[in-house]
Amino acid sequence: MRTLWIMAVLLVGVEGSLWQFGKMINYVMGESGVLQYLSYGCYCGLGGQGQPTDATDRCCFVHDCCYGKVTGCDPKIDSYTYSKKNGDVVCGGDDPCKKQICECDRVATTCFRDNKDTYDIKYWFYGAKNCQEKSEPC
């Protein structure tokens, strides 16, 4: 529950990428889609360790890796430009760093949609204690 509260504070208090990522998830997955990914498996939510639990959690693992490769701006707080088109997201803007953040979020959101059948409620609030295996490299 603490993780949910932390994420809620972050999403409400930030008008940057995490806020936009949540809005993007809701657009693609449905109005409350973001709640499903606040604390799921070993990688969805704050932090991440161990092996992804399933294809849905792997989306978050890849997203974490993508954020880790961003240089020159802060993926968690910097705002970017995107538009919505026929259920998809199109990243825009002139700043290459911010566009890279948007692409990380877009790819993850699309991954959630493409793997929604792998989502398993048993991994919601799974907990770090269940994610003790060695992490694979990005």
Curated annotation (Swiss-Prot):
Inhibited by EDTA and bromophenacyl bromide (BPB). The keyword Metal-binding applies. Expressed by the venom gland. Residues 1-16 form the signal peptide. Its cofactor is Ca(2+). It comes from the Eukaryota. InterPro entries: PLipase_A2, PLipase_A2_Asp_AS, PLipase_A2_dom, PLipase_A2_dom_sf, PLipase_A2_His_AS. It is found in: Secreted. The keyword Phosphoprotein does not apply. Gene3D superfamilies: Phospholipase A2 domain. It catalyses: a 1,2-diacyl-sn-glycero-3-phosphocholine + H2O = a 1-acyl-sn-glycero-3-phosphocholine + a fatty acid + H(+). Ca(2+) binds at Y43, G47, G48, D64. Keywords: Antibiotic, Antimicrobial, Blood coagulation cascade inhibiting toxin, Calcium, Disulfide bond, Hemostasis impairing toxin, Hydrolase, Hypotensive agent, Lipid degradation, Lipid metabolism, Metal-binding, Platelet aggregation inhibiting toxin, Secreted, Signal, Toxin. Binds 1 Ca(2+) ion per subunit. One of its GO terms (cellular component) is extracellular region. The active site is at H63, D105. Its EC number is 3.1.1.4. One of its GO terms (biological process) is negative regulation of T cell proliferation. Homodimer; non-covalently linked. Snake venom phospholipase A2 (PLA2) that displays edema-inducing activities (activity that is inhibited by EDTA and dexamethasone), inhibits phospholipid-dependent collagen/ADP-induced platelet aggregation, possess hypotensive as well as anticoagulant activities. In addition, this enzyme shows bactericidal activity against E.coli and S.aureus. PLA2 catalyzes the calcium-dependent hydrolysis of the 2-acyl groups in 3-sn-phosphoglycerides. Belongs to the phospholipase A2 family. Group II subfamily. D49 sub-subfamily. This enzyme has been found to be not myotoxic, not cytotoxic, not hemorrhagic and not lethal. This is Acidic phospholipase A2 BthA-1. It comes from Bothrops jararacussu.
